Design a protein with these regions (language model features):
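Alpha-helix-loop-beta-strand connector modules within alpha/beta enzyme cores
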Residues: 1-8, 46-55, 59, 95-116, ...
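N-terminal active-site wall of soluble small-molecule enzyme domains
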Residues: 1-46
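Hydrophobic faces of well-ordered beta-strands that scaffold small-molecule active sites
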Residues: 6-10, 28-32, 54-58, 77-79, ...
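Active-site beta-loop-alpha junctions enriched in small/polar residues
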Residues: 11-15, 35, 59-61, 82, ...
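Catalytic cores of alpha/beta
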Residues: 16-24, 61-74, 120-138
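Glycine-rich phosphate-binding active-site loops on the catalytic face of alpha/beta enzymes
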Residues: 30-39, 78-90, 133-156
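Glycine/Thr-rich beta-alpha phosphate-binding loop at enzyme active sites
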Residues: 60, 70-111, 149-152, 156
């Protein structure tokens, strides 16, 4: 399809049986939801031969402790800041505290190499707060980059860059 690395967020049931249909590349990030399968570790294992970065997505209501048993299987966590389904939602207030809990868990369990991606209502203000907490990948959408008209997209990207939101290298 493309040589550009993709960030694939799979919101599908039993994703482990569908990976071969997608065309996953070594440079891709693939996020599966904790709730999408009864066999989370197996699903993450099935991703390993593709050589991609394996991320686990957790919804706002998913407790942080579910990460404890999968940290050895993942390269990153996709922390949803809104309930999945549609653009334009406001951030779920408890997710800022949840981001702090995730960072604390990673440190406590000696897994600081696991990166945290945040998705949902990533406004300029929220991106700055989440960067301070420790998030390193930001899914920018209608709250930042795609605000306003098409001519303004470049300026919106510059505004995010101005926040000095730097992506941690996940290849280390």
């Amino acid at each position: 399809l493309t040589s550009i690395p993709l960030d694939l967020h799979l919101m599908i049931k039993d994703p482990e049986y569908k990976f071969q249909w997608i065309g996953i590349q070594e440079t891709d990030i693939v996020s599966i939801h904790y709730e999408s399968t009864f066999q989370v570790q197996r699903a993450l294992d099935y991703l390993q031969p593709f050589g991609c970065k394996r991320f686990l997505a957790i919804n706002p209501a998913t407790p942080v402790y579910v990460l404890e048993e999968v940290l050895d299987y993942i390269d990153g966590i996709n922390l949803l800041m809104v309930n999945p389904g549609f653009a334009g939602q406001k951030i779920v207030p408890s997710t800022m505290k949840k981001a702090e809990k995730v960072m604390h868990l990673l440190k406590e369990m000696h897994h600081e190499e696991v990166v945290v991606e945040v998705d949902g209502n990533i406004s300029y203000e929220n991106a700055a707060k989440l960067r301070k907490i420790g998030a390193s990948i930001f899914v920018a959408g209608s709250s930042s980059v795609f605000r306003g008209d098409v001519c303004g997209y470049g300026n919106n990207i510059k505004k995010l860059r101005f926040l000095k939101v730097e992506q941690k290298n996940i290849d280390d």
